Amino acid sequence: IFMEKITDRTPSEALNDNLKGLYMGMDIFKRYEKKCKSNDLKNLLNDVINLYSKEACELSSKISALGDSPASNVGILGKASEAIYNIKTVTADTDSEILEESIKAFKTGIIMFQKFLHEKEDQLDEESIDLVKNMIQENEKLSKKLNEYSSPHQANFF
């Protein structure tokens, strides 16, 4: 009811929505990183946090260049979504559960960027398109690392 389609938003509003999503992702992955025990998994989750932080800076700069104010937090709707993820964070106790939830959350972020690009590409300047495409590529590379890490640990998921 409260969610607008991405197509109903201006390009900078939609970029801001993605920025809020990055803030939410950083919060979620910071919680996961604190809970996990494996140093390798902590390092991998820290890579996600660092990537999201870098992308948040890039999006903020682009939104400012478009003449709008970048979001500085997840916003009201983001808080509601964050509450749902908080429940999942609380229930994910083992490293394998944390990894499984991390992969799901990370894939959701990639899907949101792909959806944004699909619905907004004809309204974006070339620089914005390149920025989002690069973000998708960087996220897909890190997604491969998460999946590669999960392969030897997958037996713990079932």
Where are these predicted regions, by residue range?
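Alpha-helical bundle segments that constitute or directly flank the non-heme di-iron/ferroxidase center
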Residues: 4-36, 97-122
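Conserved alpha-helical segments that form or flank metal/cofactor-binding pockets of metalloenzymes
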Residues: 40-77, 146-150
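Carboxylate-rich helix-loop segments that flank metal/cofactor sites and access channels
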Residues: 57, 61-97, 104-111
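Preference for long, well-ordered alpha-helical segments
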Residues: 105-158
